[in-house]
Amino acid sequence: MVLVEPRNIIGRKISQIRKLKGITQEDLAARLNVQRINIDRPMISKIENQTREILDYEIKGMSVALCVPIEDFFK
């Protein structure tokens, strides 16, 4: 089995916060699209599974969509 190096450090935290707030990946994608951030459900899955990078403006959008300070992603 080949281990893949994580492509981001906050994906698991995004998943945890999203689930605690009862938000589906589909709902999160819709909230991001309202902000004109083009991320769909499969991309959110990849971010949460740490197989896709996340850009700075996407982190900001996730913060707004999940109603948490950006710092919470790094705790």
Name each region found by the language model.
Residues 51, 55-72:
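DNA major-groove recognition helix of helix-turn-helix/homeodomain DNA-binding modules
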Residues 1-9, 74:
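A detector for short, charged/polar N-terminal pre-domain segments
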Residues 14, 25, 41, 56-59:
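Helix-turn-helix DNA-binding elements, focusing on the entry/boundary residues of the two helices
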Residues 12-33:
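Short basic helix-loop element that most often maps to the first helix and adjoining turn
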Residues 33-53:
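Recognition helix of helix-turn-helix/homeodomain-like DNA-binding domains
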Residues 14, 28-29, 44-47, 73:
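Conserved hydrophobic/aromatic packing and binding residues within compact polymer-binding modules
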